[in-house]
Amino acid sequence: MANIIKVIGREIMDSRGNPTVEAEVHLEGGFIGMAAAPSGASTGSREALELRDGDKARYLGKGVLKAVAAVNGPIAEALKGKDALAQAELDQIMIDLDGTENKAKFGANAILAVSLAVAKAAADAKHVPLYAHIADLNGTPGVYSMPLPMMNIINGGEHADNSVDIQEFMIQPVGAKTFREGLRMGAEVFHSLAKVLKADGHSTAVGDEGGFAPNLASNEAALAAIKVAVANAGYELGKDITLAMDCAASEFYDKEANIYDLKGEGKKFTSEEFNFFLQGLTERYPIVSIEDGLDESDWDGFAHQTKLMGDKIQLVGDDLFVTNTKILKRGIDNGIANSILIKFNQIGTLTETLAAIKMAKDAGFTVVISHRSGETEDSTIADLAVGTAAGQIKTGSLSRSDRVAKYNQLLRIEEALGSKAPYNGLKEVKGQG
């Protein structure tokens, strides 16, 4: 038994200067777990609710004192005396206590912070690393892998104040033999890209996720700049480095007109036309993964996209699936996409997150563990990626300590596990292995 004696919630700051919830869980014997909830900018409409205070006189309405009060009040009372090793039971207690479909009473930010803190406290009580405890909870004890990183080196959309409509342009160091080598390759391309952008007279200011946020003539111009940067860094595009995109297409979808409006380059597309636009990019560049290539509700369009490209590249559902097993099952049953992005604050507990990962893997989908644009120094997703052998991780660029914290944790884990956690590179990407 690792009984909970105290649960503490507090309001802390995230990487965008907005409040978020941090929770501490204290166990008998002095064991402690602490975790913070992240926050998204481009959010799916079906995500679990992030509870904000709405008091415009305080943090412009974005305070989280209501969520913190839920942690310090009803959640703390309900969990006191319970065994922290019983993760699923404790998560269910919080879900039932909240009593809403989308965790609107307490907020997914409150429930998730406690859920993750429980797991960390339990790992502490077991005297094992968090990734090892997560593997136990996942039913795969001792099974690990180092994730292939998707490094977001050009930011657009809701993550930057620029003319680029597509939200993320990412590189994947598929030619590396280890995570450490892959991280180095990514960093070298990132610095090479800074020189390319400067030489063309572009800004090298960074967006929410640490990537550069230049004003470019088109979305394809971002891919062209990265292509030059990869070559200048001494790598071969398509062999050493592959490309990935997160369109976050819901953000530029005009629901009334039923069109995809790339305002930055003055182009408009129907659903089918946008699929062909994306297909064209994959033919000109080694893009092996596209996330949220259409609006979250455009299921007919996604069916077409999957038929068009699903046997060649990875099609990732983020806003589409929101880490929700009910929605994911519908996608699996209807042949929609072939991969899922996992963001634990979209669903609100570690147990539900693990269930989504299992369902995806059982269906032959690939899994990408992801940060949010509003992050903290909390590096739990690094342990989640290794402990579930997810295979891929998205945690931003090679700048901003809120992003680099996750990479540094992965370096530590790889050092500790060595050959027990293989780095499989391109084999992890759907359609490429």
From Swiss-Prot:
The lineage of its organism: Bacteria, Pseudomonadati, Pseudomonadota, Gammaproteobacteria, Alteromonadales. Mg(2+) binds at D246, E291, D318. InterPro entries: Enolase, Enolase-like_C_sf, Enolase-like_N, Enolase_C, Enolase_CS, Enolase_N. It is found in: Cytoplasm; Secreted; Cell surface. Belongs to the enolase family. Component of the RNA degradosome, a multiprotein complex involved in RNA processing and mRNA degradation. It catalyses: (2R)-2-phosphoglycerate = phosphoenolpyruvate + H2O. The keyword Cytoplasm applies. Its cofactor is Mg(2+). (2R)-2-phosphoglycerate binds at Q167, K343, R372, S373, K394. Pfam families: Enolase_C, Enolase_N. Binds a second Mg(2+) ion via substrate during catalysis. Pathway: Carbohydrate degradation; glycolysis; pyruvate from D-glyceraldehyde 3-phosphate: step 4/5. Keywords: Cytoplasm, Glycolysis, Lyase, Magnesium, Metal-binding, Secreted. The keyword Transmembrane helix does not apply. The gene is eno. Catalyzes the reversible conversion of 2-phosphoglycerate (2-PG) into phosphoenolpyruvate (PEP). It is essential for the degradation of carbohydrates via glycolysis. GO terms for molecular function: magnesium ion binding; phosphopyruvate hydratase activity. NCBIfam families: eno (TIGR01060). SUPFAM superfamilies: Enolase C-terminal domain-like (SSF51604), Enolase N-terminal domain-like (SSF54826). Its EC number is 4.2.1.11. This is Enolase.
